[in-house]
Design a protein with these regions (language model features):
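Glycine-rich phosphate/ribose-binding loops and adjacent secondary-structure elements
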Residues: 186
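Catalytic-core "active-site belt" of small-molecule-metabolizing enzymes
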Residues: 1-183
Length: 186
């Protein structure tokens, strides 16, 4: 656990936090870890006020933090801080979308979709943080369990099939409190 919030410093902005996150990413790559993609957190506006976060954030997903499984899977929670579990829709991209991509462009870049569970963590006790803290904390990512993938082309004819592929009954909703997740593009 951290003993102090980075955001307690008045000059610690989201830009500063993302710069720190990129510096940590470079150190992890230098020691042999491989980024697999990104997770997007706080996609549910309904929880923003609770966590003092007012926009989605992103963090890197690493080869050492992801487990792919076709059935049952096991994740170790050693060395995590105050872990929580969140259901996720995990997206694999065959190409990195352009920065100004349209929804159609994003769908064209998509390769597969899979159900998943993310273990999120907070290094700040009690999950008390501001947006820059979550970015500095790797987007709160700890582990990701990715279930069986459905090819994107199998899903294009019927949008309801996306929900079925993710294990949700059509019209059944989803993870209302989930922080969001994603993988791909590395």
């Amino acid at each position: 656990p951290w003993t102090d919030r980075p955001s307690n410093r008045p000059d610690y902005t989201l830009d500063a936090a993302y710069a720190d996150a990129l510096a940590v990413r470079a150190l992890r790559v230098a020691r042999g870890e491989r980024p697999l993609g990104y997770k997007v957190g706080f996609t549910n506006r309904g929880i923003w006020a609770t966590y003092n976060v007012f926009a989605p954030i992103w963090g890197t997903v690493w080869d050492r933090s992801v487990v792919f499984c076709e059935g049952e899977g096991v994740l170790r929670l050693d060395h995590t801080c105050e872990p929580r579990i969140e259901p996720e829709a995990v997206f694999g991209f065959r190409a990195t979308p352009a920065p100004a991509a349209t929804m159609a462009d994003l769908f064209d870049a998509l390769d597969w979709v899979a159900p998943g569970f993310e273990i999120v963590q907070s290094h700040l006790p009690g999950w008390k943080f501001a947006a820059p803290d979550t970015v500095a904390d790797g987007g709160l990512h700890a582990r990701l369990l990715v279930g069986p993938a459905a090819a994107h082309l199998d899903l294009t004819d019927n949008p309801d099939s996306i929900l079925r592929a993710l294990g949700n009954p059509v019209g059944g909703g989803g993870g209302a409190g989930a922080g969001g997740g994603g993988r791909g593009g590395g």
